[in-house]
């Protein structure tokens, strides 16, 4: 019998646009793990899980979402900076909103600059227009490794749930892990180290994160974290953020209440 499966992880930061004639032009930036459900919550009001700032002001359209964040924390930090550009030392060059500038236009201007400065410039993000009729050219344009997409996000692949392991199974798995070695340095790999594996079929690469980072950085001297590189085993191109995200999916993690994280902490102050 096959084991149960769960959807793959999705962390997105989105931009809502208000279509209510009384509030038309208002926008809202938020974090979600499920875009379709999240926009329904916003339109249903705070009692149904929507945010305080959007409750009673709908209908709202989710017009843009960025996804591909390696973790919920990375997405939440991006969300906060997009909401509060004046408080981010990375965005001091952007400048405040102009008196003649629409809120939507201002938020796109902030976003364009965010995608061009550290630490966000090196994330494996996709900029996705859920409403193509709202599309604006970002200036400056996103980095070449960040594609522009249209329409709803593709379904997330199902990841098999790990069955509960007996003590004997756990000991056997630890013993096997102790015998595995890093492709690059030949030292032993332990399960808790979360070795990086090449996603291409048939590629035998298993490496310490530090070892593979150093290998990739040979192609990007002067950088602290790699953006991309070529697999030392199969020679195919790999995005660093995708590798790290896959590593996190394949390891046991602490349970995180993502539903609570979807409502920004500032909304919780409005009681």
UniProtKB/Swiss-Prot annotation:
GO terms for biological process: DNA double-strand break processing involved in repair via single-strand annealing; DNA repair; double-strand break repair via homologous recombination; negative regulation of telomere maintenance via telomere lengthening; positive regulation of t-circle formation; t-circle formation; telomere maintenance via telomere lengthening; telomeric D-loop disassembly. The keyword Acetylation does not apply. It holds the Pfam family GIY-YIG. GO terms for molecular function: 5'-flap endonuclease activity; crossover junction DNA endonuclease activity; zinc ion binding. SMART domains: GIYc. Its main location: nucleus. The keyword Zinc applies. Its EC number is 3.1.-.-. Keywords: DNA damage, DNA recombination, DNA repair, Endonuclease, Hydrolase, Metal-binding, Nuclease, Nucleus, Zinc, Zinc-finger. It comes from the Eukaryota. Residues 9-94 form the GIY-YIG domain. CDD domains: GIY-YIG_SLX1. Belongs to the SLX1 family. Forms a heterodimer with SLX4. This is Structure-specific endonuclease subunit SLX1. It comes from Rattus norvegicus (Rat). The gene is Slx1b.
């Amino acid at each position: 019998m096959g084991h149960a499966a769960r959807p793959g992880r999705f962390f997105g930061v989105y931009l809502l646009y208000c279509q209510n004639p009384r509030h038309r032009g208002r926008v809202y930036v938020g974090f979600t793990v499920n875009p379709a459900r999240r926009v329904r919550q916003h339109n249903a009001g705070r009692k149904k899980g929507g945010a305080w700032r959007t409750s009673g002001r709908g209908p709202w359209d989710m017009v843009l979402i960025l996804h591909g964040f390696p973790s919920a924390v990375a997405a939440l930090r991006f969300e906060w900076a997009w909401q509060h550009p004046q408080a981010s030392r990375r965005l001091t060059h952007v400048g405040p909103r102009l008196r003649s500038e629409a809120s939507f236009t201002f938020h796109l201007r902030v976003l364009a600059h965010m995608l061009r400065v550290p630490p966000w410039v090196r994330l494996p993000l996709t900029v996705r227009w859920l409403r193509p009729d709202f599309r604006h050219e970002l200036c400056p344009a996103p980095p070449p490794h960040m594609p522009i997409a249209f329409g709803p996000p593709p379904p997330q692949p199902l990841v098999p749930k790990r069955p509960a392991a007996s003590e004997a199974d756990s000991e056997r798995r630890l013993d096997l892990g102790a015998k595995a070695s890093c492709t690059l340095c030949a030292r032993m790999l332990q399960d808790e180290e979360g070795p990086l594996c090449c996603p291409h079929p048939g590629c035998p690469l298993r490496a310490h994160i530090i070892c593979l980072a150093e290998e990739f950085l040979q192609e990007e001297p002067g950088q602290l974290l790699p953006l991309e590189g070529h697999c030392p085993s199969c020679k195919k191109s790999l995005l660093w953020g995708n590798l790290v995200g896959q590593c996190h999916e394949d390891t046991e993690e602490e349970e995180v209440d993502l539903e609570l994280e979807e409502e920004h902490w500032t909304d919780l102050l409005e009681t």
